[in-house]
Structures are given as C-alpha cells and as structure tokens.
C-alpha cells in the first residue's frame, strides 16, 4: 500500500448530504493536532467531524505493556482532549476493538468518511486492510496519510530492488537519491473545526471520556510521579528546549558522557515520537531551519538527523516482515543457538544480576520507563552475546513491557543489532558491566540513586562490591550474598566464551569468510575504553535512543569492508547452519 492513499468507496449521493461528509478521524499513533494531514482530510468539506480513539479495556488488563506506558498514553489522550476542547470539539474514547466498534459507529453516526494516519508496521497494515474492506462495504470513503515516518518506506524498498536495505550505509545512499521529506502540514484551526462541529452530549465523559489507570485495572498504590508527562503540549515544549542547544547544531559539539547523561532529560523526545505526540517531520524541519540559520544557509548533512534516520531505517526493515520481532521465520535474522535460562532472564529483568551497573539501569527502566541509549546497549549486550547468552527475543519482550518509546520496529531492530543477529554488528565488541559504568560515572552516584542499598559503599568498590573487604561491606550495611546478590556470572570468563561461540557461528556463515570479518579477532575487547562521546541528539532529546552508533575501540574494523560489500539476499540469510552449543559457564552464584 502506498504511504498516502484515498480509497474511494461507493458512497450513495444522498448519504453525503448537501452540507458535506460526516467524518470520523481515527487516532492511533499520531496523538497530536500539528502535522496531522489525515485530520485535515477529515475536516475538508465536512459538515461533522468526530475524533475517535479506540481502546480495548480487555487488552489493557491482559497485555504485557507496563503501567508507565499506559499512563503516558492516557496522559497523551487527556492532553489531546484538552486541545480539542479549545477547538469546541472533544475526543471520543470508544471502548472495544476496531472491527467491532466501526460497524456500530458507521450506522449510529451516519459516517461517510473515515481518515487515519498510515501505519507501516505489519500488524497495523493487516488491521487497517480489514477496516478499509469493512468501510468500503458500508459505503464509507477512507483516506489515509503518511505522517509517522519521514519517507515513503515502500519507495525506499522499490529503489533497493524490492527488498529492504540491511545496512545503514545502503539506507543512506537510497534516501540521498530521494526528494526531501514532505514539509509538516499546518495544524487544524478553530475556524475549520467550527464549521464541522459534532454535537457533544452532556454525558460525554461517562460514555467517551479518557479512562483512569484504575478503570483499566492497574493498581496505583505506591506509583511514583511520572518522570515523562505524556501529550503534545509537553512534546512541543520539549522541542523548543531541545532547539535552544544552538551550539551543538552549529558546531557538532558532542557532549561527553557523564552521570547526568544517564538521567531523564527535560529535552528528551523519544516517547513523544513513538506515540506521535511530536511529528518527526516537524522536528526534522525545525532542526533543518535552525542549522541553516546558524550556518548561514548551508545545507544540513544527513548526519544531523542521524537518530531520526536510524528510526526510519528500522521501520523500513520491518514494514514487510511480520516476523521481525522473532527469530523463527525471520529472513534477516541469524539463527544463533541461544541458551534457555529463565532464572538468569528473571534476574536481569528484575535488576538482580549482582552487577550494580546493570541492576541500576534495569531499576531505572522499571521505575521510569526510560534509559539512555548507551545504557540500553550495555544491558542488551549483557543479556545476549556478552554474558548471559539469552535470546534477544526475551529482551524485546521486557523492553516492550517497560520502555515508553518501545515500538515493534525500533525495539526489535535494535535488539537484533545489539545481539549481532542482524545488521552486521561487530560481535567481538563487548561492554564491560563494571568498566563502562565506572568510566561514565566514576563517583557511582547513578548506582546510589537507583540502588540505595549500595549507597554506603565507597566509589572504589561500588561497581564491584563483591571485591570489597568484609569490613567495608559491614560499614556499608550491605553484605554481598545476603543484602545484595553476588555476580550472576564471571564476566571475564563468560564474555571470552561467548565471543568464541559467536566466532564459530560467523565462521559457518560462508558469506562472511571472504570479507575478512574474522581476520584478527581478539579473545575479548572491552568496548569503550575511552570516555564516550555522546551523540548530540541523545541527551538533547534522545530521538530513538536505541538507535545504533559507531563503536570506538582500537584500529579500523573489518566492519568497514563488510559495509562496502554487496548485501546478502534475504533467502541466503535463512540458510543458517546451527552451531553445536558449547558448555555453558556456570553462574558464579545463585544468590538472588
């Protein structure tokens, strides 16, 4: 399906009425009034417009999505309703499933036009095809518009010979041949809405109001205040703060990573882009305009939009792949024989691995719904190829539950990338769960913030408290193995073993042999041996915080040769020799 389309159903002339269409705009993502071309299409020539969000209470009660993400969504809906009130309209939150809800609404409201934002993800495309078929049978015109991505993803795939690009370099080459993204559409005005105002009943809030967390079955006792406030209003305020960083835009200054980088920033944007509270096109062109202003009309380089483009890259890779979030049946995923270790997975997810750096990150994620993109790299590497050798699919599910900005494409794509299962990552780079944190925050304040039981440890021992003398542990009132778990693995031994495992797997992928990927693989490389230069976009509003970045370690990598090579076809990637599993490293301790 094209990214923007009109499905012209056979609409009886009398149903349109002399005064125009009876429109319903269906909000899903795209929870905003700015740059919403599908909403403008609903208003155009209409006598009546209703804005609808369909929420299934049963799904809320049964899904694995965590409370922080539901709270962010409900806040975003409240904000949207508030904005619509200012236009003398309201948001209709309809309970149920789209396939059940729309036939009733079409009949009850006399709907003649349905509009919504195009969804590029496989599940969304399948759902929308069914709704469009239903609308056509009911004589309802359907209008869809693309505004969740910068580019027409189908066009990118077409330019690449009808297959998605599997390297970021190739993706950049393709979009450099395309026209610039469309400019953001103007926001709907009060004058436009006034001419097509729908009747609002006195009991609107009872029937169509935004539900509370309690109504959806979430216990809120002990729930802390939201670190990230949902909604378009907050998103636009954050965008303004983000763009105040003119020095970065002008000079490519990359602030060095430090403890403050790990905390939620008032300019962070990733959850707002995920829910569509902020338009990616508005952000793109605000950055573009600012760059031209401070650089005196110079054309911005693609790298200025790096985090946005990584998001686009993963959307392109996923759009025609319904198995993108799993190994089996996924044509781009290397079939690595991961271990089944539910105990290790649970300790990782609950922040009980015995490595304070990893546990603090997972605690922040569970409490706040967000972690810095390099923190994501650290915990993803630890779960998969670095230490626990657990499938990236398990990581996807945990992040999908806890992470505010998790979506199908970017979440799964990032996990495949970080676990070396796709997109040609350098498997011999390994994040040290002690050294990386210590270099980032030598004082250990981040650890003390999220693991207060360790706050009494001096900085010397806080990243590896198991090495602290007994007297230090007693003084800190935290005995390792009693009050805080011992390390779940011996990192030095396990990481070497896992690099060897990965080396075996890549050796069996004959496609790589001629590319010298294994020419000189050290037994273990602790990545990021120098302080990290943080991408400018991350703390100034981390766009797609899971987005990959160049890893800095040692001499030029053979990955460069790999990127220059022709991409392997999807069919060949499915023919993976399964490697005989090597003996699993015994956990150093089973303390919980």
UniProtKB/Swiss-Prot annotation:
Subunit info here reads:
Component of the circadian core oscillator, which includes the CRY proteins, CLOCK or NPAS2, BMAL1 or BMAL2, CSNK1D and/or CSNK1E, TIMELESS, and the PER proteins. Interacts with TIMELESS. Interacts directly with PER1, PER2 and PER3; interaction with PER2 inhibits its ubiquitination and vice versa. Interacts with CLOCK-BMAL1. Interacts with BMAL1. Interacts with CLOCK. Interacts with NFIL3. Interacts with FBXL3 and FBXL21. FBXL3, PER2 and the cofactor FAD compete for overlapping binding sites. FBXL3 cannot bind CRY2 that interacts already with PER2 or that contains bound FAD.
Q: List the disulfide bonds.
A: none
In its record, the post-translational modification comment is: Phosphorylation on Ser-265 by MAPK is important for the inhibition of CLOCK-BMAL1-mediated transcriptional activity. Phosphorylation by CSKNE requires interaction with PER1 or PER2. Phosphorylated in a circadian manner at Ser-553 and Ser-557 in the suprachiasmatic nucleus (SCN) and liver. Phosphorylation at Ser-557 by DYRK1A promotes subsequent phosphorylation at Ser-553 by GSK3-beta: the two-step phosphorylation at the neighboring Ser residues leads to its proteasomal degradation. Ubiquitinated by the SCF(FBXL3) and SCF(FBXL21) complexes, regulating the balance between degradation and stabilization. The SCF(FBXL3) complex is mainly nuclear and mediates ubiquitination and subsequent degradation of CRY2. In contrast, cytoplasmic SCF(FBXL21) complex-mediated ubiquitination leads to stabilize CRY2 and counteract the activity of the SCF(FBXL3) complex. The SCF(FBXL3) and SCF(FBXL21) complexes probably mediate ubiquitination at different Lys residues. The SCF(FBXL3) complex recognizes and binds CRY2 phosphorylated at Ser-553 and Ser-557.
Q: Where is this region: Disordered?
A: 532-592
The name of this protein is Cryptochrome-2
Effect seen on changing residue 517 to D: Decreases FBXL3 binding. Strongly decreases CRY2 degradation
Q: Which GO terms describe its cellular component?
A: Cry-Per complex; cytosol; extracellular region; mitochondrion; nuclear speck; nucleoplasm; nucleus
Phenotype of the disrupted gene, per the record: Animals show longer circadian periods. Double knockouts of CRY1 and CRY2 show slightly decrease body weight and lose the cycling rhythmicity of feeding behavior, energy expenditure and glucocorticorids expression. Glucose homeostasis is severely disrupted and animals exhibit elevated blood glucose in response to acute feeding after an overnight fast as well as severely impaired glucose clearance in a glucose tolerance test. When challenged with high-fat diet, animals rapidly gain weight and surpass that of wild-type mice, despite displaying hypophagia.
**What upregulates or represses it?**
Shows no clear circadian oscillation pattern in testis, cerebellum nor liver. In skeletal muscle, under constant darkness and 12 hours light:12 hours dark conditions, levels peak between ZT6 and ZT9.
What outcome follows a substitution of residue 501 to Q?
Answer: Inhibits interaction with PER2. Does not suppress its nuclear localization. Inhibits its repression activity on CLOCK|NPAS2-BMAL1-driven transcription
Q: Which domain of life is it from?
A: Eukaryota
Q: Show the cross-link location (Glycyl lysine isopeptide (Lys-Gly) (interchain with G-Cter in ubiquitin)).
A: 29, 125, 241, 347, 474, 503
Q: In which tissues is it expressed?
A: Expression in the retina is restricted to the photoreceptor layer (at protein level). Expressed in all tissues examined including heart, brain, spleen, lung, liver, skeletal muscle, kidney and testis. Weak expression in spleen.
- Please give the PROSITE patterns that the UniProt record associates with this protein: PHR_CRY_ALPHA_BETA
User: According to the UniProt record, what happens if one changes residue 265 to A?
Assistant: Reduced in vitro MAPK-catalyzed phosphorylation. No effect on inhibition of CLOCK-BMAL1-mediated transcriptional activity. Very little in vitro MAPK-catalyzed phosphorylation
């Amino acid at each position: 399906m094209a990214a923007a389309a009109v499905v012209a159903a056979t609409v009886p002339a009398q149903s349109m009425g002399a005064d125009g269409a009876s429109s319903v705009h269906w909000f899903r993502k795209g929870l905003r009034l700015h740059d919403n071309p599908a909403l403008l299409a609903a208003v155009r020539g209409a006598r009546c417009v209703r804005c609808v969000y369909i929420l299934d209470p049963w799904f809320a009660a049964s899904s694995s999505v965590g409370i922080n993400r539901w709270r962010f969504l409900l806040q975003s809906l409240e904000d949207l309703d508030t904005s619509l009130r200012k236009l003398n309209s309201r948001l209709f939150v309809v309970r149920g499933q789209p396939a059940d809800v729309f036939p009733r609404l079409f009949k009850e409201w006399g709907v003649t036009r349905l509009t919504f934002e195009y969804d590029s993800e496989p599940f969304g495309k399948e759902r929308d095809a069914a709704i469009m078929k239903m609308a056509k049978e009911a004589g309802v015109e359907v209008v869809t518009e693309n505004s969740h991505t910068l580019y027409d993803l189908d066009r990118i795939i077409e330019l690449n010979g009808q297959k998605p690009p599997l390297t970021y370099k190739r993706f950049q080459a393709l979009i450099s041949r395309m026209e610039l993204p469309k400019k953001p559409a103007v926001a709907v005005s009060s004058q436009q809405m006034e001419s097509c105002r729908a009747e609002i009943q006195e009991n609107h809030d009872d029937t169509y109001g935004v539900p509370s967390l309690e109504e959806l079955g979430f216990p809120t006792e002990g729930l802390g205040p939201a670190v990230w406030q949902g909604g378009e209003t907050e998103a636009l305020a954050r965008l303004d703060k983000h763009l105040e960083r003119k020095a970065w835009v002008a000079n490519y200054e990359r602030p060095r990573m430090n403890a403050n980088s790990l905390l939620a920033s008032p300019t962070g944007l990733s959850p707002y882009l995920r829910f569509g509270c902020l338009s990616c096109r508005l952000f793109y062109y605000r950055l573009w305009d600012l760059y031209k202003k401070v650089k005196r009309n110079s054309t911005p380089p693609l790298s200025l939009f790096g985090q946005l483009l990584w998001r686009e890259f993963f959307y392109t890779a996923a759009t025609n792949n319904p198995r993108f979030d799993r190994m089996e049946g996924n044509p781009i995923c290397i079939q690595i024989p991961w271990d089944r270790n539910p105990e290790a997975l649970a300790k990782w997810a609950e922040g009980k691995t015995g490595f304070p750096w990893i546990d603090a990150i997972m605690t922040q994620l569970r409490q706040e719904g967000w972690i810095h993109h390099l923190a994501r790299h650290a915990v993803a590497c630890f779960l998969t190829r670095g230490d626990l050798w657990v499938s990236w699919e398990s990581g996807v599910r945990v992040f999908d539950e806890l992470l505010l900005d998790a979506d199908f494409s970017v979440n799964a794509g990032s996990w495949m990338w970080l676990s070396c299962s796709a997109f040609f990552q350098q498997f011999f780079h390994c994040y040290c769960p002690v050294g990386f944190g210590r270099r980032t925050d030598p004082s250990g304040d981040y650890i003390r913030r999220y693991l207060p039981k360790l706050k009494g440890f001096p900085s010397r021992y806080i990243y590896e408290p198991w090495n602290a003398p007994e007297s230090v542990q007693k003084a800190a009132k935290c005995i390792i193995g009693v009050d805080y778990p011992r390390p779940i693995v011996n990192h030095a031994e396990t990481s070497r073993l896992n690099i060897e495992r990965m080396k075996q797997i890549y050796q069996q992928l004959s496609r790589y042999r001629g590319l010298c990927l294994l020419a000189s693989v050290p037994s273990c490389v602790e990545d990021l041996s120098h302080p990290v230069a943080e991408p400018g976009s991350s703390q100034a509003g981390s766009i797609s915080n899971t987005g990959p970045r160049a890893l800095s370690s040692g001499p030029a990598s053979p990955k460069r040769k790999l990127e220059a090579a022709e991409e392997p076809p999807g069919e060949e990637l499915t023919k993976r020799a399964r490697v005989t599993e090597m003996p699993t490293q015994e956990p150093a301790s089973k303390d919980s």
